[in-house]
């Protein structure tokens, strides 16, 4: 949706299907099989020898906080390596302890050629970075990477302090604690409501989401319900809890609590979210 009204766009950019466990036509498809589906599209429509790079979010952000099935990322990375394709992980949303590891690719031991980061890298200060193999980054001529405000010393100092805090407070472990609390609470609510409006609960660490569907459709058509999602978000806002929606169909609520959040405040926020879901079920 973000490209609406913009253009023209750069040519020769192709989009391959992601692993989306909740909405796969075949619910039994494995991550590796989903990867082979994407690879087949690349081979048939483009040709592996014509691909310069593959860029992927290890966990899709605006697309709906989609965690691919286990095995998907390693197979895509393997395909890239086999064919001399640069494999780029977009960790702008998922990086720096957000998912319970420093980077989301680490959950499956994937090592990208390049990693893009921003957001969490500097604790809110404007900073982004590209990190990767020396042979790639050193190939760029002097001044070829960056811009007028590249390497801003204040933002870089903030990033160093933020990373030190992540290490000192072990925010990777804290992200995993948040995941356990949130999934436990929401999972119990879904079980109680039965075949209601909660279609899927997913995510890793402190990067979590709820996908809402029409009541009674979670196990069958999984019909997206953007209207109910907006009502829930509005309810939360009125009660002082700011949450954001995302997803292709606008039917996903994403939860991104600060990794330094205390248990009491986290539970307070979940209380409001649960009340909002109950009020709209």
Model-identified regions with their sequence ranges:
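Conserved N-terminal phosphate-binding loop of PLP-dependent enzymes in the Aspartate aminotransferase
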Residues: 1-281
């Amino acid at each position: 949706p973000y490209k609406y009204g913009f253009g023209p766009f750069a040519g020769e950019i192709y989009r391959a299907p992601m692993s989306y466990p909740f909405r796969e036509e075949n619910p039994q498809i494995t991550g590796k099989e989903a990867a082979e589906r994407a690879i087949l599209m690349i081979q048939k429509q483009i040709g592996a020898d014509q691909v310069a790079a593959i860029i992927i979010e290890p966990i899709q952000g605006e697309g709906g906080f989609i965690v691919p099935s286990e095995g998907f990322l390693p197979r895509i990375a393997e395909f890239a390596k086999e064919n001399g394709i640069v494999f780029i992980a977009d960790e702008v949303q998922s990086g720096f302890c957000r998912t319970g590891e420093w980077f989301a690719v680490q959950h499956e031991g994937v090592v990208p050629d390049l990693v893009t980061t921003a957001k969490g890298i500097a604790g809110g200060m404007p900073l982004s970075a590209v990190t990767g193999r020396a042979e790639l980054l050193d190939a760029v001529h002097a001044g070829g990477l960056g811009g007028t405000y590249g390497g801003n010393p204040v933002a870089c100092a903030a990033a160093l302090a933020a990373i030190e805090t992540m290490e000192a407070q072990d925010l990777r472990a804290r992200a995993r604690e948040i995941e356990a609390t949130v999934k436990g609470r929401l999972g119990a609510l879904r079980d109680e409501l039965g075949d209601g409006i909660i279609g899927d609960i997913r995510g890793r660490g402190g990067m979590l989401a709820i996908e809402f569907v029409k009541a009674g459709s979670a196990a069958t058509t999984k019909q997206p319900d953007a209207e109910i999602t907006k009502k829930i978000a509005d309810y939360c806002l009125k009660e002082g809890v700011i949450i954001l929606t995302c997803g292709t169909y606008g039917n996903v609520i994403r939860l991104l609590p600060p990794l330094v959040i205390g248990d009491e405040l986290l539970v307070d926020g979940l209380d409001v979210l649960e009340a909002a879901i109950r009020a709209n079920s």
